[in-house]
Amino acid sequence: MNNAAQNIIKLEEETPMMQQYITIKKEHPDSILFFRMGDFYEMFNEDAKIASRVLEIALTSRNKNKANPTPMCGIPHHSSKPYIATLIKSGKKVAICEQTEDPKLTKGLVKREVVRVVTPGTILDDNLLDPKQNHFLVSLYSNAKGWGFAALDITTGLFKVTEFYGDDRDLLLKDEIEKFDPKEIILSENLVTGCNKPKWLEDRDNSLQSCEDWTFSFKDSYRLLIEHFKTSSLEGFGCEDMKLAISSAGALIQYLHKTQKSALEPVSYTHLRAHET
């Protein structure tokens, strides 16, 4: 029997609630899934083991009488913020899965969906932020000639883009990264797995996030930017001809839409401008 068939059988053996959990978890394999159950966020399996260790909370299990009980742990939803902060500081991402129906008005399984993914560079809650510091999310894109750089402080809307060319482009980029000190850096999958990634970026492995190569498409990125700023070109922002920087900025926006979902609506990134290094 192949692995796919075994997984189907195992899924069918689970309760409807756990089937729902497993399905949602597959969509967020790199995040700790906070699965809302009543007044608690529950975590299961490997997520539970990691969370219990990082948060120093008790690890229990479901189906204790079975041969392979399911590890689990939980936290009260009304006091989740400090727990989320601790996980983020440890380099984790947290996917918040809420009940999207009123259990009192629903027969059977309550619908649930991930409403937001909290990452080191996309924290919006003032209680989780240092008010004395900027909170930059950076996106990088490269070709054989240069680097595209985009930086956004999601809490203020400050959005800067620039490019680096020439023999010292890697050094210039390194200086810029150190200046902005980003909480998170977005790279294309090709850059993460390829040989073009500068060695010094490896020191920031905990803050690196891999995104699909297509999210760095110049054409799509340009369209995203002019649609958001309601303009026909980017000349007024000083970056019309910055193809690498525009590609970086577009991937950054794609990442925000992917992680913030509805929470992105009140976030302003209206202050786009070419950044002088």
Locate predicted features.
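Charged catalytic and DNA/RNA-contacting regions of genome-maintenance
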Residues: 2-273
